[in-house]
Amino acid sequence: PIAGSMVLAAILLKLGGYGIIRMMQILPTTKTDLFLPFIVLALWGAILANLTCLQQTDLKSLIAYSSISHMGLVVAAIIIQSPWGLSGAMALMIAHGFTSSALFCLANTTYERTHTRILILTRGFHNILPMATTWWLLANLMNIATPPTLNFTSELLIMSTLFNWCPTTIILLGLSMLITASYSLHMFLSSQMGPTPLNNQTEPTHSREHLLMTLHLAPLMMISMKPELII
């Protein structure tokens, strides 16, 4: 069910990050060097989740693994226990909550018309449903964290925090962001571009789908213009 996936990605997954923030406040303040294994594990987990995304053929699985990779960055930022890290982690949780939920919604829109979630079988929608393709492009650009979105602000804060803590982490972060951009563009091109299947009786998009996407992306864009609301 699509509603379950949207709630899971947008809210329940972020409760784990919220729990870590709360636990860090009651733990005695220790040197972050003690948390080095956990930070490396979080970043390495983010890279592995991104690599798993690259080899996914199922649209829904790809979006789910994408959420896991972003949570790796959140965990690493929280564990460092700096103000910038906490701000970046909270901003990324909110931004990715909107983005991943929107992507799940779009995946369901595609599934209702093609009855398949295999990437290569859902291609050619840019000719049939240009508005849906526009929503896909916007959601993927936010997933990549292009400026001036909140995703970009939050990832910049997390990157600054990790680089200030240990400059070597920029290699892992850079690799993670490169793979994120790769699979996001791959997902967009595979599901929207290419030749349109013959004898395709596709019903047009409904107003409720456009409304749902607007309610996902409009708040995110508005928060992006005034990030001090949450940072």
From Swiss-Prot:
UniProt catalytic activity: a ubiquinone + NADH + 5 H(+)(in) = a ubiquinol + NAD(+) + 4 H(+)(out)
GO molecular function: NADH dehydrogenase (ubiquinone) activity; ubiquinone binding
Annotated GO biological process: ATP synthesis coupled electron transport; electron transport coupled proton transport
Record's bilayer topology term: Multi-pass membrane protein
Entry keyword annotation includes Lipoprotein: no
Enzyme Commission number, as recorded: 7.1.1.2
Role, per record: Core subunit of the mitochondrial membrane respiratory chain NADH dehydrogenase (Complex I) that is believed to belong to the minimal assembly required for catalysis. Complex I functions in the transfer of electrons from NADH to the respiratory chain. The immediate electron acceptor for the enzyme is believed to be ubiquinone.
Name of the molecule in the record: NADH-ubiquinone oxidoreductase chain 4
Upper lineage: Eukaryota, Metazoa, Chordata, Craniata, Vertebrata
Gene: MT-ND4
